[in-house]
């Protein structure tokens, strides 16, 4: 069993960071990793179990939680989902670019979906021992750290997600005082999310998904209950809300 437990679930397992997290958890000794995604493309391997679950489909989340929960509690849950852009949707540079349907889609992907995962999967954390749920957020969701403006929908959705994490941490502590619920900032990662902005990223400031995953798992290994509800960067530092 690894330092973050024997049983884990990763949402967004077919994404760059999510897939890397699945393999990093296994490499560090987690016995069983459930790899959840909307379309199962993760190959079944020793200790890696692919499952279909859509973060915006409560029936699929309930079914996945029931299936996994029947096998026992989870030591680690990681929600590695999110959306910055999509066909016809790009981050806004000015207020005049805000469109309600685009903003709703970004909020759904970055806040509503993870909140629904918490609703169904936080009850699977054990009551009497250390466990953790982490969701990928972003530094741009920090209100106090916003110096450049823009990216209205994405920034607001991540700020809302950070508030959901805080409230979920408070609620979870009443049932499972050793559990830790956090938002994680992975840094800039070579992925589909950052691809349209690659030319604007200074050399050396973007890392491979495998490096990002290793950093995040190290952070998870050292979490303690006093950090619950916080936004934590890949280097373990606390980001102010």
What are these model-derived regions, one by one?
Residues 26-44:
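Conserved glycine-rich Rossmann-like NAD(P)H-binding loop of the short-chain dehydrogenase/reductase
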Residues 83-87, 91-106, 127-175:
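Catalytic loop of short-chain dehydrogenase/reductase
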Residues 179, 183, 191, 195-241:
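C-terminal helical subdomain
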């Amino acid at each position: 069993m690894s330092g973050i437990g024997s049983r884990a679930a990763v949402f967004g397992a077919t994404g760059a960071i999510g897939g890397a997290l699945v393999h990093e958890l296994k490499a560090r000794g987690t016995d069983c990793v459930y790899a959840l995604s909307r379309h199962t493309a993760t190959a079944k391997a020793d200790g890696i179990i692919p499952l279909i679950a859509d973060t915006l489909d409560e029936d699929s989340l309930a079914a996945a939680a029931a299936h996994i929960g029947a096998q026992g509690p989870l030591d680690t849950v990681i929600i590695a989902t999110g959306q910055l852009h999509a066909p016809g949707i790009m981050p806004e540079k000015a207020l005049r670019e805000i469109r309600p349907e685009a903003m709703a889609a970004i909020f759904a992907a970055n806040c509503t979906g993870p909140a629904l995962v918490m609703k169904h999967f936080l009850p699977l954390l054990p009551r009497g021992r250390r466990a953790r749920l982490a969701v990928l957020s972003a530094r741009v969701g920090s209100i106090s750290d916003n110096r450049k403006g823009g990216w209205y929908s994405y920034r607001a959705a991540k700020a809302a997600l950070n508030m959901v994490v805080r409230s979920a941490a408070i609620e979870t502590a009443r049932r499972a005082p050793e559990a830790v619920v956090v938002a994680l900032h992975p840094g800039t990662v070579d992925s589909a999310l950052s691809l349209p902005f690659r030319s604007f990223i200074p050399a050396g400031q973007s890392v491979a998904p495998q490096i990002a995953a290793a950093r995040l798992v190290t952070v998870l290994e050292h979490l303690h209950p006093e950090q619950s509800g916080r936004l934590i960067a890949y280097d373990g530092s606390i980001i102010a809300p």
